[in-house]
Amino acid sequence: MASASTENGEELMNYGSNSDSEESEYSENEDTQVCDKDSQQNSNADSGYPLDSPELQDSKTTGQKGQNKSGKTSIGAVHPNYGFGKRWSKSEDVLLKQLVETHGENWEIIGPHFKDRLEQQVQQRWAKVLNPELIKGPWTRDEDDMVIKLVRNFGPKKWTLIARYLNGRIGKQCRERWHNHLNPNIKKTAWTEKEDEIIYQAHLELGNQWAKIAKRLPGRTDNAIKNHWNSTMRRKYDVERRSVNASGSDLKSSRTHLITLIKSGGISKCMNNMQHNKESGGEAVNKSENADGASVTAVKGGDLAQESQDDHQKGSNLAHLSMQHLIKLTMPRQTPIILKRTRKHIPETHHQAGCSSSETFNQEEAAGNARSRPPSSPVISPIKSLPFSPSHFLKSPCLTTFEDMDLRASTPVTKVYNRVGMEIKKEMETSSIETPHKSQLGPRTPTPFKKALAAIGKKRDGRRYEPSSPSSLVEDLAEIIHEEHLSNSLTANNSKMMGAADQNSTLSTEYNAQSPPHMKRARKSLLSTWSSNHPYNAGSAKRIQPFETETPSKFLTSPGDILKDTLCSEQDLPFDEGRKENRPFHNRRINKYRGGLTYDHVIDPKWARVACGKSRDQMFMEEQAYACLKNLSCISRSLNFEKQKCLVNSFDRFGSL
């Protein structure tokens, strides 16, 4: 009874079972990419029991009948989906192994221990997955020869019968081995472009139904086609498919938007606006600046009484315009604010004398309405320019604008009014944070003048000096420079009365003590006259200091003594912070050494003899050195080290002598 049920179950369930565990267990090294075609179509492959298996369909039919002839209700009759779609757990596998070890393959006793499984499910789980006698390794040459021989005898469909002659193999393994590797009708050559095209077109129609695709390619198995698609073709054709889908979605969205605008009455409003412009006959502006600075030309209307016939003809021509003419009037794409450059404001030109006052009033009223009209809350963003004409037509300014349709979107945008007479906002040319132009800056005051003005402010008890006129400022500065010049001349006269021996140190000390501050010396460069021109120097024979003279290049007729005084010695130079010779302490130390030390030009002959190496011992050592060098230069190099040692010893003896 048990053996009969086993044969029937194996015969019925052979093509239906497709668990992943089985597939991984008996797959060969060369079959690593092999998968069963049924595993793709069944989502419950891991359970080992597909929904379309014959025996499970039989159980459904029995469940629909209700009861058996014996009158007892079966499990499948009460629960038509009993145990389906539920994977086997590890605990169930362990329990099944223990029960088989205890009771053997007696499924009538083992089956009731699994409340959520049918007896046939338990039997198939053991026979196809858990049986330790199953061979799940690679196929041998003997097994392949046996499969080929059995297929010739029984045909390529009796896989359960063929599996009985192969110990450890089941019918599914034999079937996959034959169809994927052993069948002589299988093509194992490289894939051609024609086959790739057939697979691509079939995949577009059928999807992943590899068995149906294999029927269109004789000599190729479904498994080989699937592996070729996943490994090679998907990367190549997915990019093309995405581009086709993207262009199709754009075309679909543009068509939908066009239909929406047509239904909302945009075209009818466009024609009404054109008719209204023809009847009103106002004057249009010759050129108007739009958002991007592009000029749009319009018709200039003159006297209505004289040109009524021409306007009528023009209006009739506008009524018969095609869409291609309307595309030329499309509003250009607005430049983002962050990319706009500051433009200088161009004043509006006056209207010509021939324009009537009523026409001017109409234009101002239209511009005022455009400015006073507030932008509504977020409206839909303007569509981007597409390569075909519907989008250009929809962006025409004469059509119903998106703002008038009150379409809401997540991104708020500002309205772009393309009205005649619309004024452009004047942008600020300068800002407080911008650097002003050089021409706008006032004259800069030189540093010596600033210091002189600060000195005048000190004399005025800290009050700021404000001259009444430029001439008074010059007079005050000349007075300050004159006073400083007198003080310096007195200091120089006093310094000349010092003794000749201490002249250098005394001059530097007196100069550092009584010389004017550093900031006052800069003002002496402002003297515009030489000492000969000053009245207080006319009767005195005072020597002009070098720092009191002007630059010689400014006075080409300067006397020679002034130029001579300009190139003075170091001791007559003004105090310089960077020169150590002008410091008091340094000067005193130098003068002390100059006055106390006396240089003797006569050299002691004994000291010269020792210093120049002319003593007796030095000359003896020099002769020995010359002798050693002379002997060593004549000896050729050799590899006889003992000979060299003898020479060295002889030299040592010669040196010791």
Curated annotation (Swiss-Prot):
Domain HTH myb-type: 87-130, 131-186, 187-237
Pfam families membership: Cmyb_C, Myb_DNA-bind_6, Myb_DNA-binding
Domain of life: Eukaryota
UniProt biased composition (Acidic residues): 20-33
GO biological process, one term: chromosome condensation
Entry GO terms, CC: DRM complex; euchromatin; Myb complex; nucleus
Compartment list: Nucleus; Chromosome
InterPro entries linked: C-myb_C, Homeodomain-like_sf, Myb_dom, MYB_TF, SANT/Myb
Region (Disordered): 1-78, 348-382, 429-448
Residues bearing PTM Phosphoserine: 381, 389, 396, 558, 569
GO molecular function: DNA binding; DNA-binding transcription activator activity, RNA polymerase II-specific; DNA-binding transcription factor activity; DNA-binding transcription factor activity, RNA polymerase II-specific; RNA polymerase II cis-regulatory region sequence-specific DNA binding
Alphabetically ordered keywords of this record: Activator, Chromosome, DNA-binding, Nucleus, Phosphoprotein, Repeat, Repressor, Transcription, Transcription regulation
Protein's UniProt keywords contain DNA-binding: yes
Biased composition (Polar residues): 59-73, 354-363
Biased composition (Low complexity): 371-382
Subunit structure: Component of the DREAM complex at least composed of Myb, Caf1-55, mip40, mip120, mip130, E2f2, Dp, Rbf, Rbf2, lin-52, HDAC1/Rpd3 and l(3)mbt.
Record's function text: DNA-binding protein that specifically recognizes the sequence 5'-YAAC[GT]G-3'. Component of the DREAM complex, a multiprotein complex that can both act as a transcription activator or repressor depending on the context. In follicle cells, the complex plays a central role in the site-specific DNA replication at the chorion loci. During development, the complex represses transcription of developmentally controlled E2F target genes.
Record protein name field: Myb protein
Organism of origin: Drosophila melanogaster (Fruit fly)
Taxon lineage: Eukaryota, Metazoa, Ecdysozoa, Arthropoda, Hexapoda
